[in-house]
């Protein structure tokens, strides 16, 4: 298994980008979320994302999904749930350009698992990003905050 991407909107513009965590940041974090019945979007995060989108930022989700590597849910189940998240955000006025996710278990030592920068490197290969004007948003300083520090980017923590 390798880093996987789902690109929803491709563009050729160089844009500042919000790299945002999914579980616990955009939606309620349930153990190995993959059922649409469990999907609960946080309104405050939607407001934050709409703020940045209104200032011209691109929105990209970056998320660790070890439930795939552990066999708790399939790649298809992940995609269905993630599409549900992205579609709900779109209904609420937030356009997500892509999702980059690490399907590996933490003990596999991959280069894509946050707080490593592999997911961001993949995004940089697919999109033209004004990295100096970009930021990371997440709910965990030890993962999302460390990702931001590894990239030299600002970090905005959310808590619910």
Swiss-Prot record:
Gene Ontology molecular-function annotations: D-glycero-beta-D-manno-heptose 1,7-bisphosphate 7-phosphatase activity; magnesium ion binding; zinc ion binding
Site positions per UniProt: Stabilizes the phosphoryl group: 63, 114
Catalytic residues in the record: 21 (nucleophile), 23 (proton donor)
Enzyme class: hydrolase
Keywords tagged on the record: Carbohydrate metabolism, Cytoplasm, Hydrolase, Magnesium, Metal-binding, Zinc
One Pfam family, short name: PNK3P
GO biological process, one term: carbohydrate metabolic process
Subcellular location, record wording: Cytoplasm
Principal localisation: cytoplasm
Cofactor(s), names only, from the UniProt record: Mg(2+); Zn(2+)
Source organism superkingdom: Archaea
EC number from the UniProt entry: 3.1.3.-
Chain positions recorded as Zn(2+) binding sites: 102, 104, 110, 112
Signal peptide (from-to): none
InterPro entries assigned to the protein according to its UniProt record, in alphabetical order: HAD-like_sf, HAD-SF_hydro_IIIA, HAD_sf, Heptose_bisP_phosphatase, Histidinol-phos, PNK3P
Site residues (Contributes to substrate recognition), renumbered to this chain: 113
Subunit structure, as described in the record: Monomer.
PANTHER family named in the record: D-GLYCERO-BETA-D-MANNO-HEPTOSE-1,7-BISPHOSPHATE 7-PHOSPHATASE (PTHR42891:SF1)
Name the UniProt record assigns to this protein: Probable D-glycero-D-manno-heptose-1,7-bisphosphate 7-phosphatase
């Amino acid at each position: 298994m390798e880093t996987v991407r789902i690109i929803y909107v491709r563009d050729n513009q160089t844009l500042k980008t919000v790299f945002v965590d999914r579980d616990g940041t955009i939606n309620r974090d349930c153990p190995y979320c993959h059922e649409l019945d469990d999907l609960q979007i946080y309104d405050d995060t939607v407001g934050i994302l709409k703020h940045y989108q209104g200032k011209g930022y691109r929105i990209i989700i970056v998320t660790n999904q070890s439930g795939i590597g552990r066999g708790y849910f399939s790649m298809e189940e992940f995609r269905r749930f993630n599409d549900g998240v992205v579609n709900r955000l779109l209904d609420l006025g937030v356009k997500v350009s892509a999702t980059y996710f690490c399907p590996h278990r933490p003990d596999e030592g991959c280069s894509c698992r946050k707080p490593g920068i592999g997911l961001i490197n993949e995004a940089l290969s697919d999109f033209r990003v004004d990295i100096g004007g970009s930021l990371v948003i997440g709910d965990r300083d030890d993962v999302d905050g460390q990702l931001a520090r590894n990239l030299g980017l600002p970090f905005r923590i959310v808590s619910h």
